[in-house]
Amino acid sequence: MSNSLGKLFQITSFGESHGDCVGVVIDGVPAGLAINVDEIQIEVDKRKSGAKAHTTPRREDDRIEIFSGIFNNFTTGAPICLVIWNKNIDSSEYERTRSKIRPGHADFTGFMKYGGFNDYRGGGRFSGRITAGHVMAGAIARKLISTIGIEVIGYTAELGGITAKLPKHKDIRQNISQSDVNCPDLAASKQMVALIQQAAEEGDSLGGVVECIGLNLPVGLGEPVFDTLEGELAKAIFAIPAVKGVEFGAGFGASRLRGSKNNDPFNIQSDQIRTTSNNCGGILGGISDGMPLHIRVAVKPTPSISLSQPTVNLDTMTNTSLEIRGRHDTCIVPRAVSVVEAMTCIVLADLALRAGIIPRVIKQ
């Protein structure tokens, strides 16, 4: 099992959904970065259950404990260990149905790969619960890249087929704060909430699309040919449970354009070389080009649904059916926004360190 990501800014994730805790160890954080637990807690609170509409009934406080690497509200240069304790655990439903593999989950593949020794409760290591550790690491990465002016903004762009109309970048954060689903289009947000309510009443679930924008990236982030900016981002984002697709800029839409329409013309803007369009999503040749980074992430519907589904009983090797009565989200897209942001920040921090743009000691 591979649990680490990054080269200079490296995170190692640990914990399971129904284990004692989830957490992360972060190696390579420069010394002297001002950070306190409240700044990390703010990011973690964005993804926790109960923060948005129709999230899982499992309520966790998600209070952070710092075990190492931060002293007097500054990073020391030592590994940072952050932990959240799991307190609201109910494994009864998973014990009741443990022999029945849940469609859409990693029960079958995890059982086969690890010989049945894996922790199946709540999805174990495959659960979205582990992303709390990603978000803790992302909070530190966000603070680190802010020292060179980079800002990362994520939002719900589509949910259940309802597509948002996007305002200007400067208005996105304000609108998101007024939305129960992290959508900057407030009219679409109300429609999304109603659709989630309908799906919940029907015992079903919904998917959607998260968009993430990176602003003020310097030219030069990315290490071709195998550690390109989009390659590293895609790897990190695909580590988020339920993500089924990632595209940059025009993405798959570029395949339907002619070169004359897809190419982004260059010009001089405020003494800087920029492009007049951004079909490339801020990346050329695997390297940031100074334009806004633009990522779209496809998130599948929550596989845990209350409807009866055909499946297999592993103990008897017979066909059977399953109705899931556990605690689950009707739609995880709004909560996934903070995780996509976190993984983006982590990758940008790592590549900025590798490029020498961020120093090993932060001078205040």
Curated annotation (Swiss-Prot):
E.C. no: 4.2.3.5
Enzyme class: lyase
Molecular functions per Gene Ontology: chorismate synthase activity; FMN binding
GO biological process: amino acid biosynthetic process; aromatic amino acid family biosynthetic process; chorismate biosynthetic process
Alphabetic keyword roster: Amino-acid biosynthesis, Aromatic amino acid biosynthesis, FAD, Flavoprotein, FMN, Lyase, NADP
InterPro entries: Chorismate_synth, Chorismate_synth_AroC_sf, Chorismate_synthase_CS
Cofactors: FMNH2
Record bears the keyword Iron: no
Cofactor binding summary note: Reduced FMN (FMNH(2)).
Pfam families per record: Chorismate_synt (PF01264)
Assigned GO CC terms: cytosol
Family according to the record: Belongs to the chorismate synthase family.
Name this polypeptide is given: Chorismate synthase
Protein species of origin: Dehalococcoides mccartyi (strain ATCC BAA-2100 / JCM 16839 / KCTC 5957 / BAV1)
